[in-house]
């Protein structure tokens, strides 16, 4: 049972319903996290817009941003975000071996030096951000522009927020929408 209720499509304003419908079209569900945030429409709107800007704009590949999101979620022990973003990462071309290899990325041949620097940033920001040195930043900057560093930091920071929110609520992974929910939103179910 959820610690805080998750609002159904029928319980939100028409404006938020449009965002729910976009989630249903794009993902086949409305993430429980966002259904919980819907209790505060202003926060819901800004969080969905922020997530879109962080993950889907800029010059870095979304695959790389999702890779650091998965590592951040591993470090925070957030099953909810891990389930969702592992699936997204796999769809974007990350392999199951790479997902598993994130746990020992320093010794893994599965990641480029640029990817290792991004993963290191995820660990530093999540576990010991005050200790991230000028030398570490210079190593990161060998591979990424200032704007790209901002993109990485925004993804890592955003998911530290999302992870902690979901951990406190003991949020279970979002299930696919029912045929009824999809029909209500005018979304055709995907046939297997």
Segments (PLM) and residue ranges:
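Hydrophobic alpha-helical segments
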Residues: 1-192
